Amino acid sequence: MNPAAAPLTLALSKGRIFEETMPLLAEAGIEVPENPESSRKLILPTSDPGLRLIIVRASDVPTYVQYGAADLGIAGKDVLIEHAAQQSGRLYQPIDLNIAKCRLCVAVRQDFDYQAAVHQGARLRVATKYVQSAREHFAAKGVHVDIIKLYGSMELAPLVGLADAIVDLVSTGGTLRANGLAAVEDVMPISSRLIVNQAALKTRGARLQPLIDAFRRASERIA
């Protein structure tokens, strides 16, 4: 098949981003007949023969787009910041879709006086998956920290003495409260953005641009 005639590929992750992307696609007249939560397929067709979806880990979406395995993708700001810190290639981010909204926060045990520790100049151990965002946040505030990278179960770290604080995504705060933690500081608001491979935009722009425009219109109507 002529690469220029091949379907466009949109990289998505399972879960909240996939679920909140579906209304945007529907608004653009595109339906996805299979749900990745119930299907084992990693490549999903759509009602538009010119577009297919690939299902990857959230942290891998920017990599698939950067290297051209996907023409475009949808990823959270948190993921994009961490990706940019590790990769030299830049991704075109034409639209903040305002989906999968949450906050990146500093959280501690409810009995830990975070403000007092900061005021006293204590060096804090901070566990997080979002190393770059955490490092930039504490550097800007002049707080001395040692960053410990974890990949999951972040709430456990302060409870077992691994860390004084965590930096993690928070939606309702229910998981923090259930584990005796409290958010004490916002790092940044998070939402998901449309990202596009820059080479594809040049070589397949006539097909990509209408889809980008459709996402923009859909996000504005649904917002």
From Swiss-Prot:
It catalyses: 1-(5-phospho-beta-D-ribosyl)-ATP + diphosphate = 5-phospho-alpha-D-ribose 1-diphosphate + ATP. GO terms for molecular function: ATP binding; ATP phosphoribosyltransferase activity. Catalyzes the condensation of ATP and 5-phosphoribose 1-diphosphate to form N'-(5'-phosphoribosyl)-ATP (PR-ATP). Has a crucial role in the pathway because the rate of histidine biosynthesis seems to be controlled primarily by regulation of HisG enzymatic activity. Its EC number is 2.4.2.17. Belongs to the ATP phosphoribosyltransferase family. Short subfamily. It is found in: Cytoplasm. It comes from the Bacteria. Heteromultimer composed of HisG and HisZ subunits. It is an enzyme of class 2 (transferase). The gene is hisG. Lacks the C-terminal regulatory region which is replaced by HisZ. It comes from Bordetella pertussis (strain Tohama I / ATCC BAA-589 / NCTC 13251). One of its GO terms (biological process) is L-histidine biosynthetic process. Pathway: Amino-acid biosynthesis; L-histidine biosynthesis; L-histidine from 5-phospho-alpha-D-ribose 1-diphosphate: step 1/9. Keywords: Amino-acid biosynthesis, ATP-binding, Cytoplasm, Glycosyltransferase, Histidine biosynthesis, Nucleotide-binding, Transferase. This is ATP phosphoribosyltransferase. One of its GO terms (cellular component) is cytoplasm.
